[in-house]
Amino acid sequence: PPNEEWIIEAENHIRPSKHNHDGYSGKGYIETSTSLNSNITFEVEVPTSGTYYIDIRYANGNGPINTENKCAIRTLFTNGRPTGPIVMPQRGKDEWSNWGYSNPVMSVLHAGKNTISIIYIKPQDENMNGETNMALIDFIRLRKGNQRPLIRLFPPIIFPKND
């Protein structure tokens, strides 16, 4: 079917967080910050090659939704290649049980095993707050696209070489 969906529970791949918040799926969730779980890799298997939309179900209670600039920003990689930014804005001060979805990133996956990585890269993933860049990740969601979109939402990321 054209609207297939896969859920990859984060806590099945990385030790779950010890926080005690409600509303998550599965058996828990993981914390990601600039120093904790800043490079997360999952292996996924899909039956057919094609376009997939990848997003993250997350919670971010670091501040109010309209100020403080404490969103968590990461770079999504698929099969070792940068695919686009993942943005997880704060959902309200101390709203750690308020779960929502990040922006979706379009990626081409091949039939069989693929790797998906969520990585904090400095300076490109720094937010305007400069200190707080953290979220709780419940799961990664893959949705099969039924056709290749005419407009690509995010251009490819080009990283400068460090000599």
Residue ranges and their predicted role:
Residues 1-163:
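Extracytoplasmic
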